Amino acid sequence: MYQILYGNQVVEEDLPNILEPWKAEIQHAIEAKLMTRPEVYSRPLRRSLKGYRKLRVGYYRIIFRIEEKTVKIFVIQHRSTVYYTTPDRI
């Protein structure tokens, strides 16, 4: 079982801007996929985001990194903006 750590900006900026039905869907995906087998359910990112991974939840993307038994989440945003925001947060 993996431990989940959220970045400050995820809690302060990303989550408040997500509608409630999507929050529930994202929370379910984190609990069902990232806490159990994140390397199986996610895909690695390339180029400047190498070393990070993404999990797709509908129109949203969760950008994170696996460090031993910890999953550190850096960004949860709509797919249209997530890749512009991510380099500033890592």
Describe each PLM feature range.
Residues E20-R37, V75:
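A short, compositionally biased N-terminal segment around positions ~18-40 that is enriched
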Residues V57-G58, E67:
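Structural motif
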Residues I4-L5, R65-I90:
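Enriched for short, Lys/Arg-rich terminal
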